[in-house]
Design a protein with these regions (language model features):
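Short linear motifs at protein or domain termini
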Residues: 1-95, 102, 106
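Short, intrinsically disordered, charge-balanced linker/junction segments flanking boundaries
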Residues: 176-188
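A short, mixed-charge helix-start or loop-turn motif at secondary-structure junctions
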Residues: 21, 78-83, 126-130, 174-178
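Short, hydrophobic secondary-structure boundary micro-motifs
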Residues: 16-17, 51, 158-161, 177
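Conserved amphipathic alpha-helical segments that form helical-bundle/coiled-coil interaction surfaces
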Residues: 89-174
């Protein structure tokens, strides 16, 4: 599943490519039953469409479940699509987080507010020490932003948490997170 999904998401298997269950069975040395399960998973993600006489056809990205964590991971893992995926996730993040923060300011419990302040202090300390590109920083940053989304009290915003977290993890994993934060970032 990961090899095929990654191949489709990276563009190695371009839109319109056709393959069959037999092709999957032969290529990966798997049974038709397992190949059928892979086909169903790819279909559910919108990456392929099946047709009786044709087989499986790779679909355009507009058909994909682009917020699914598997699709995000496959796009991040590919050098061909990583930059576009990070840009898309960053844009989603900048669109959703200000609204989430405003709603969190209105709806957060006292415990959530206290936890956010404590995490903000920890982020400032780690970032000022030039360690904003470490797993320690990432762990606190993910918890901080996840709590903001949760505290918004809006189930639709909360449902986007994993997508927002993906860009944060991607920036650190692929060396795009600066070690030292700007003053503006420390006080966000």
């Amino acid at each position: 599943l990961d090899v095929l999904g990654g191949g489709i998401c990276s563009g190695e298997m371009p839109v319109g490519s056709v393959f069959t269950l037999g092709d999957l069975s032969e290529r990966f040395g798997i049974s038709r039953t397992v190949a059928r399960e892979v086909m169903r998973a790819l279909e559910q993600l919108g990456l392929v469409a099946s047709s009786r006489r044709v087989g499986l056809t790779v679909q355009p990205m507009a058909q994909w479940s682009v917020l699914d964590q598997a699709v995000i991971r496959w796009r991040l893992n590919s050098q061909q699509t990583r930059e576009d995926q990070l840009r898309s996730l960053a844009l989603l993040r900048t669109a959703i987080e200000p609204v989430a923060a405003r709603e969190a300011a209105r709806h957060a419990t006292e415990a959530q507010r206290a936890e956010l302040l404590e995490m903000a202090d920890r982020l400032g300390t780690i970032g000022a020490a030039g360690r904003a590109d470490t797993d320690d920083f990432l762990e606190v940053d993910v918890a901080f932003h996840s709590l903001i989304l949760e505290a918004s009290g809006n189930e639709m915003i909360v449902a986007l948490t994993e997508s927002v977290v993906s860009v944060m993890r991607g920036r650190t994993e692929f060396g795009l997170q600066p070690a030292r934060l700007s003053d503006k970032s420390v006080h966000h």
